């Protein structure tokens, strides 16, 4: 049986296209007075809080209220959002130029575990830096909080494939998280696991060897 050529590429966002530093958010919350943020005893509760936001099970308003309860201080929405989005850094222009070139030969998509507070932040940053909507960079943007589930749930990959009418065997997915890559493999897609910030070093070589 012949191997089908890659026609579609699904990108992760954070660590692949967007530079992020989660430690900056940890530091920002500590600066708000959350001194035991992410210490071992709090980790399960914190992870549940973040995952509920990313899967759309919690609204931004409920998230902020939960953060206020944990802070035990009445910080306003803007202070909480600033701390929560502190991890969001830049999108290097050379990555965007590369994606714009890829669009000439491939259908490109985005599939990201994210939330509405972060989405607003990086969309605004992208438009300020590049002069057009982030929605226009990809054929379709799939966000976990809008889909009601998050990676590595295999169903999120299957739904993205179905809604975009993609054949798994013709689709490459790129992610910097090994657990997400392992889940994507179960759908029949081709996979590329990269280290954060190495898209321009990793993808061209992969496509050259797997054209």
Role assignments for model-derived ranges:
Residues 1-7, 116, 122-211:
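Asp-based, Mg2+/Mn2+-dependent phosphohydrolase catalytic module
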Residues 3-93, 104, 115:
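N-terminal helical cap/lid subdomain that shapes the substrate entry/recognition surface
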Residues 12-15, 56, 102, 110, ...:
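Generic structural signal for small/hydrophobic residues in well-ordered secondary structure
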Residues 26, 96-100, 181:
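Short amphipathic alpha-helical segments and helix-helix/interface helices
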Residues 33-36, 72, 106, 165, ...:
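Glycine-centered loop/turn motif at secondary-structure junctions
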Residues 94-105, 137:
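Catalytic-core regions built around general acid/base machinery
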Residues 95-98, 112-120:
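Alpha-helical transmembrane segments and their immediate juxtamembrane flanks
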Residues 108-110, 191:
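Hydrophobic beta-strand scaffold residues
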């Amino acid at each position: 049986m012949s191997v089908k050529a890659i026609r579609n590429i699904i990108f992760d966002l954070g660590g692949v296209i967007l530079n992020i530093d989660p430690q900056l958010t940890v530091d920002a919350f500590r600066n708000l007075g959350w001194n035991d943020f992410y210490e071992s005893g709090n980790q399960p509760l914190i992870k549940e809080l973040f995952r509920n936001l990313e899967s759309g099970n919690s609204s931004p308003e409920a998230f902020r209220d939960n953060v206020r309860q944990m802070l035990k201080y009445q910080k306003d929405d803007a202070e909480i959002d600033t701390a929560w989005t502190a991890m969001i850094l830049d999108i290097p222009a050379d990555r965007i130029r590369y994606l714009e070139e890829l669009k000439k030969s491939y259908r490109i998509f985005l599939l990201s575990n994210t939330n509405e507070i972060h989405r607003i932040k990086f969309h605004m940053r992208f438009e300020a830096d590049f002069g057009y909507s982030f929605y226009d960079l990809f054929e379709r943007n799939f966000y976990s909080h809008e889909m009601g589930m998050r990676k590595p749930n295999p169903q999120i990959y299957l739904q993205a494939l179905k809604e975009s009418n993609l054949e798994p065997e013709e689709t490459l997915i790129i992610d910097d998280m090994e657990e997400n890559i392992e889940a994507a493999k179960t759908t029949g897609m081709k996979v590329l696991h990269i280290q954060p910030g190495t898209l321009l070093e990793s993808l061209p070589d992969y496509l050259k060897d797997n054209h």
